[in-house]
């Protein structure tokens, strides 16, 4: 709805001239993390994470290095810096294994703890589950507990295999979209 008046004034051709072959137009994104400028910003769908982080948001704060991009909010996933040239359109994001979700992303520097970021996402999804299906109701709690163990120094190498197994099981057996995406951050 944010673009309707501009499209009516300038025409559909004007709007379709923005974006790329995968998606036309623009999208409003919520930006956060260790970038100099956070907030809501509108971008052409062909814009990349790198362009947003460096050219629009002023780069990573305190001249640190980009460690990870968390795309798609709490049901989204993590991307390494090597994927920063990915365009912010639906298909390009799916190609690298993340969803657009709420059209948000956070860019974090090397001081961020990926385990803590994953715990936050899993904890949020655990609180939001309806509890109808066992994979979400029990599986998300088990995953959160394993992540707690790892972050508090009680983790074992076999916990990684258990986490992977739990994530795969939840992804395949959950009854709704929340369950299917609740473990993407892990």
Would you name each region that the model predicts?
Residues 1-186:
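Redox cofactor-anchoring modules in respiratory/redox and cofactor-processing assemblies
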């Amino acid at each position: 709805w944010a673009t309707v008046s501009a499209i009516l004034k300038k025409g559909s051709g004007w709007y379709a001239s923005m974006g790329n072959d995968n998606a036309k137009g623009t999208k409003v994104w919520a930006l956060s993390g260790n970038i100099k400028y956070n907030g809501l910003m509108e971008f052409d769908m062909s814009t990349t994470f790198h362009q947003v982080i460096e050219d629009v948001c002023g780069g990573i704060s305190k001249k640190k290095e980009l460690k990870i991009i968390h795309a798609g909010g709490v049901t989204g996933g993590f991307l390494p810096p090597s994927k920063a040239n990915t365009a912010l359109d639906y298909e390009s994001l799916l190609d690298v294994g993340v969803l657009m979700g709420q059209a948000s992303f956070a860019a974090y520097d090397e001081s961020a703890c990926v385990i803590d970021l994953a715990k936050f996402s899993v904890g949020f999804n655990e609180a939001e589950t309806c509890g109808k299906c066992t994979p979400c109701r029990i599986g998300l709690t088990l995953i959160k507990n394993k992540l707690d163990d790892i972050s508090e120094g009680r983790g074992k190498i076999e916990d990684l295999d258990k986490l992977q197994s739990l994530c795969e099981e939840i992804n395949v057996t959950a009854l709704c979209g929340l369950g299917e995406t609740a473990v993407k951050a892990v």
